[in-house]
């Protein structure tokens, strides 16, 4: 899949993005927001990148003006607790995402999701879309609410609380 917005190219992640990805997740604040350990051995970011490469729908977000990866978007099957999953329609998608710290607060992720979400409903037959964020990740919560996601449930993960936001 190739998708384009006013400022972004959204492309399947490939080996060419590895260096930018490793640089991008070097910031401990991003690691914490995403649930990675704030301190990690230098061998871990490449391992995370290669794990993402193994996913069917792992996308690199590239700013057109820079031509460099500024973040990522992952589209996976939902991994929600059974009691939460039971009340939802079939064919759900979970989106996980991050914009690297040097490019945050510029609307890039909102722009990417505004393009990708309608695509999932129109072409992917999505019954719903799920995004989770930690309770202390206020920017993600505010952005998701602008995109008409609503809090559906909460559950514990890695000694923190995840808020499950759903878009129908």
Model feature map: region roles:
Residues 30-49:
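Conserved GNAT-fold acetyl-CoA-binding loop/helix
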């Amino acid at each position: 899949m190739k998708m384009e917005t006013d400022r972004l190219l959204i492309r399947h992640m490939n080996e060419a993005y590895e260096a930018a990805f490793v640089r991008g997740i070097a910031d401990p604040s991003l690691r914490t927001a995403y649930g990675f350990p704030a301190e990690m051995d230098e061998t871990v970011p490449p391992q995370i990148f290669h794990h993402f490469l193994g996913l069917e729908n792992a996308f690199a977000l590239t700013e057109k003006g820079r031509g460099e990866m500024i973040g990522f978007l992952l589209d996976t099957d939902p991994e929600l607790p059974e009691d939460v999953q039971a009340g939802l329609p079939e064919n759900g998608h979970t989106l996980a995402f991050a914009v690297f710290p040097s490019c945050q607060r510029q609307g890039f992720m909102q722009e990417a999701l505004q393009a990708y979400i309608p695509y999932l409903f129109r072409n992917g037959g999505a019954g719903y879309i799920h995004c989770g964020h930690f309770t202390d990740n206020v920017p993600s919560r505010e952005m998701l609410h602008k995109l008409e996601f609503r809090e559906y449930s909460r559950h514990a993960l890695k000694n923190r609380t995840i808020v499950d936001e759903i878009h129908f």
